[in-house]
Swiss-Prot record:
The keyword Thylakoid does not apply. Disruption phenotype: Disruption of the gene increases susceptibility to fosfomycin. Disruption also results in impaired biofilm formation and decreased virulence. Inhibited by the efflux inhibitor and energy decoupler carbonyl cyanide m-chlorophenylhydrazone (CCCP). This is Fosfomycin resistance protein AbaF. It is found in: Cell inner membrane. It is a multi-pass membrane protein. The gene is abaF. GO terms for molecular function: transmembrane transporter activity. SUPFAM superfamilies: MFS general substrate transporter. GO terms for biological process: response to antibiotic.
């Protein structure tokens, strides 16, 4: 591993850490405090959480637009510059979320301000993942790309670990009333520290040579198409596969990490500190699983690992929820880790697979579009759908069947594309 690659990996990871710190923070706050603080009370605790989860989904709506804008300019002027801008916007909006007054103080302005900040933040998030993954992939050797390109994905458990640790420290040292009143806000304000560290790390990295060469070739062309038009015109099958392939991973992840918090609180009756402690342990294990699965994709190929993970997704609900229902901490931990292990089989190879499917001059646009469109139909709605099914049927079986449907979509999608392991990133440039 060269010094340059080390810097690039660190620079790509830090944005992902900031992104997932906020997302786990918001998902946890939705389940624990937002329903009570920012929405009119109906007397039913589930209704408030449903409203918070609906707003959780709103943040995903702006992501595809952000992906297109950041992707277009990232393909034209460079990955690094756009990654810096996205990180700054993420930091500002997350900090401001911690400043919003409650529904009791300003009425409907509270959820309105939350919606506005979620949309702006979602726009910035739209350009983060694609740029980070591409930055690493374009610096990586062809035969080890699965491993190195999976490292930005470890920002997911790392961000969640930091968020869980912050929330755990706050909930352990504050009374429930103090945590509800002001403690949760400190967690959002802490995001500024994460972002400042990220900006400092990213200032010393540069775009890869494969991008600079492709950029020079494109500048010689008399007429260039808008990136997304070229993506949709010449790469339809890859786009469909890229979007559909995320359903199993995306829905399973939000089921295991976000919805399970509500499930453990409402059905299993675990307290906040217990849930956060279990999540902390699971995220720590998840951090090591992700690069391992990326390494396996370098050995066996992207598709075999992906397909096994997609198939296993169909079975998690029938195993995971009964394990949680026991109320035993070790079995609950097993359910969460099992879900994250399966999710990693589809999440880890995705970055290398998608990078290898598209040519350099439209890669940022294509990756960001596929990655950000999928959650609108998948993960963004997963906690809301799961909680609604739980409310209507008072059973985890319908939720498990929902996971089966997601699994089938991803299996069909991944079968649409050819194996890409070992492919040069200059293959179409």
């Amino acid at each position: 591993m060269t010094t340059t690659l080390k810097k690039v990996v660190a620079a790509s990871m830090v944005g992902s850490v900031a992104e997932w710190y906020e997302f786990f923070l918001y998902g946890t706050a939705s389940a624990l405090v937002f329903g009570e603080l920012f929405f009119q009370q109906t007397g039913n605790a589930i209704d408030g959480i449903l409203a918070a989860f609906a707003l959780y989904a709103v943040g995903f709506l702006a992501r595809p637009l952000g992906g297109l804008v950041f992707g277009h300019y990232g393909d034209k002027i460079g990955r690094k510059k756009l990654l810096q801008i996205s990180l700054i916007i993420v930091g500002i909006t997350t900090f401001l979320m911690g400043c919003i007054p409650t529904f009791h103080q300003i009425g409907y302005w509270a959820p309105t301000l939350l919606v506005i900040l979620r949309l702006i933040q979602g726009f910035a998030f739209g350009g983060e993942w694609g740029g980070a993954v591409i930055l690493v992939s374009e610096h990586s050797p062809d035969d080890r790309r699965g491993y190195w390109a999976s490292w930005p994905q470890t920002g997911v458990p790392l961000g969640n670990l930091v968020a869980t640790l912050v929330l755990l420290l706050l909930s352990k040292n504050l009374s429930p009333e103090q945590f509800l009143d002001w403690g949760w806000r400190c967690a959002f304000w802490f995001s500024a520290v994460v972002v400042l560290i990220g900006l400092w790390i990213r200032k010393n990295v540069d775009d890869a040579e494969v991008f600079k060469e492709a950029q020079a070739k494109q500048q010689l062309l008399e007429k260039q198409q808008l990136g997304i038009i070229e993506v949709l015109k010449y790469h339809k099958k890859s786009v469909i596969a890229g979007i559909g392939a995320r359903f199993a991973e995306n829905i399973l992840y939000y089921m295991v990490v976000t919805f399970s918090i509500s499930y453990l609180k409402l059905v299993v009756h675990k307290d906040t500190s217990q849930i956060l402690l279990l999540m902390f342990g699971a995220h720590l294990i998840h951090f090591f699983i992700i690069p391992f699965m990326g390494h396996l994709s370098d050995i066996f190929g992207r598709k075999p690992i992906y397909l096994i993970g997609a198939v296993l997704t169909a079975f998690w609900g029938f195993v995971g929820f009964p394990l949680m229902d026991t109320g035993n901490d070790w079995l609950i931990m097993l359910a969460i880790v099992l879900g994250l292990f399966i999710e990693s089989m589809t999440y880890s190879p995705y970055s290398a697979l998608m990078t290898e499917l598209f040519p350099t001059h439209i890669r940022y646009t294509a990756l960001s579009f596929c990655y950000q469109v999928a959650p609108i139909m998948a993960g963004s709605l997963a906690p809301l759908i799961a909680l609604t099914l739980l409310k209507e049927f008072n059973s985890s079986i319908p939720i498990s069947l929902y996971l089966v449907a997601a699994s089938l979509i991803s299996i069909v999608s991944i079968l649409l594309v050819k194996e890409t392991k070992g492919r040069s990133l200059a293959f179409k440039d």
